[in-house]
Design a protein with these regions (language model features):
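Long, charge-rich, low-complexity alpha-helical segments
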Residues: 31-87
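Acidic, low-complexity/disordered tracts enriched in E/D and polar residues
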Residues: 1-39, 43
Length: 87
């Protein structure tokens, strides 16, 4: 599985979003807004497409337990899959 390269990640005024690219244009009606943790997970997945790597980074960055971090990462990945962002 991997992140779909047809999405552009943008940060603007402390807002995080994934914007789908369709051909030569972007589709603003299908923008996926992220919170700070979602943004962190997405960027970590771009670094290394490995759940354990992302979970360990999340536990260190946000001082959460391994179990909480793993659930958050898996839930986030499942949402990305539903939206076609992670295939």
């Amino acid at each position: 599985m991997a992140l779909n390269k047809n999405f552009i990640y943008k940060e603007l005024n402390n807002e995080y979003m994934l914007i789908p690219v369709e051909g030569d244009s972007v589709s603003l009606t299908k923008v996926f807004n992220l919170n700070e943790v979602g943004s962190f997970i997405y960027k970590s997945l771009k670094e290394k497409d490995d759940i354990e790597y992302v979970v360990n980074k999340l536990t260190k960055e946000y001082q959460v337990s391994y179990d909480v971090a793993k659930k958050d990462v898996i839930d986030f990945i499942n949402e990305l899959k539903k939206r076609g962002i992670y295939e």
